[in-house]
């Protein structure tokens, strides 16, 4: 059993390969560098390129939401607050709100991509003891990265925490959309349903079930990504110019969160592509509250006619409560 750390084993393996294939340059391997020069700069490349995939995913989702919003601009439904009918809206307006949020997540990811695209070749404790800043600038330019303005032996982890927050907000947006679809798929509502294939089973015990399992899965994955953020923020604090307390955390949460968010974007796109919307049911549900959704309009008309606001509110509320009880 080896007693080498992963980092030591990797460097040893690379050294052996170079020694065998290019012995004349072997002595310059890792010359004047510290491991974090390689690892942190490589991590910046990984996160930058991964973010490009997430941006592409959100771009596709945003386009689909825009298309659906236009399709349902006249699909009237009950707007709900606290789960109770409030005033009429259209399903198109709801989707337009999702589209706007998708665009905000795109903007955040683009900023996060820029924020994380920093490298460092400043050596031990970031002191440039063996190389000058010009060498760091050359390496970063070749990699299309920006040199970290003032590094220690590592790139400061507030960058990674800021980057990660963009992932958290993206996941939370998908959860919000998926949660709404779950509510709309309730038997008592049944205004929209996620896709359900002909050979799919909703329950092992109850053959009639059509459970919103895709959207439930998305909500669960969002919780997982959010739970990682605490650890990422904890990584900001390290001892002096470097320790490795952040390393074990990042090896788990960074690749996991990026992969999960990419999966969530693809899964949500699948939900949108197969979303079954029932405008007739939306209209029926809207009408089920017997016109109570127009209570504010009635109250404002009474006020315009000269009645005091308090009296108008009381009159409409009294009538509304009677309608609630008697229909």
Pin down the residues of each PLM region.
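Glycine-rich cofactor/substrate-binding loops
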Residues: 1, 206-327
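Active-site-adjacent "gating/activation" loops or surface patches in catalytic cores
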Residues: 136-153, 157
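Short runs of predominantly hydrophobic/aromatic residues within well-ordered alpha helices
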Residues: 3, 7, 160-163, 295
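A helix-coil-helix interface module used to build multimeric assemblies
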Residues: 1-128, 132-138, 147, 200-203, ...
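Amphipathic alpha-helix face/heptad-repeat signature
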Residues: 50, 54-61, 91-98, 105, ...
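Hydrophobic stripe of amphipathic alpha-helices that form coiled-coil interfaces
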Residues: 68, 72-75, 109-112, 116, ...
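Generic, well-ordered alpha-helical scaffold segments in large soluble proteins
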Residues: 9-13, 17, 64, 68, ...
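Glycine-rich anion/phosphate-binding loop at the beta-strand->alpha-helix junction
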Residues: 105, 109, 153-247, 251
């Amino acid at each position: 059993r080896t007693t080498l750390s992963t980092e030591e084993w990797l460097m040893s393996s690379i050294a052996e390969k170079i020694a065998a294939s290019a012995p004349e340059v072997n002595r310059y391997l890792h010359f004047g560098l510290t491991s974090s020069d390689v690892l942190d700069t490589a991590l910046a490349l990984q996160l930058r390129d991964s973010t490009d995939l997430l941006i592409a995913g959100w771009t596709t989702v945003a386009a689909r939401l825009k298309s659906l919003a236009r399709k349902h601009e006249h699909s009237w439904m009950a707007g709900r607050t606290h789960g109770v009918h409030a005033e009429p809206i259209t399903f198109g307006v709801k989707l337009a709100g999702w589209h706007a949020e998708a665009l905000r997540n795109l903007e955040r990811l683009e900023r996060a991509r820029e924020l994380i695209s920093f490298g460092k070749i400043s050596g031990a404790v970031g002191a440039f003891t063996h190389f000058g800043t010009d060498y760091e600038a050359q390496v970063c330019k070749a990699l299309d990265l920006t040199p970290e303005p003032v590094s220690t032996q590592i790139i400061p982890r507030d960058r990674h925490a800021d980057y990660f927050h963009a992932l958290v907000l993206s996941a939370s947006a998908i959860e919000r959309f998926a949660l709404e679809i779950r509510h709309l798929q309730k038997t008592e509502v049944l205004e929209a349903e996620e896709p359900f294939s002909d050979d799919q089973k909703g329950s092992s015990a109850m053959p009639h079930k059509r459970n919103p399992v895709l959207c439930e899965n998305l909500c669960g994955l969002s919780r997982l990504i959010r739970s990682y953020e605490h650890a990422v923020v904890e990584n900001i604090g390290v001892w002096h110019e470097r320790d490795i307390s952040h390393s074990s955390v990042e090896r788990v949460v960074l690749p996991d969160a990026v992969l999960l968010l990419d999966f969530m974007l693809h899964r949500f796109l699948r939900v949108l592509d197969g979303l079954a919307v029932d405008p007739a049911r939306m209209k029926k549900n809207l009408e089920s509250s017997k016109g109570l959704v127009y209570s504010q309009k009635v109250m404002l008309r009474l006020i315009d006619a000269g009645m005091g606001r308090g009296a108008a509110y009381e009159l409409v509320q009294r009538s509304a409560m009677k309608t609630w009880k008697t229909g």
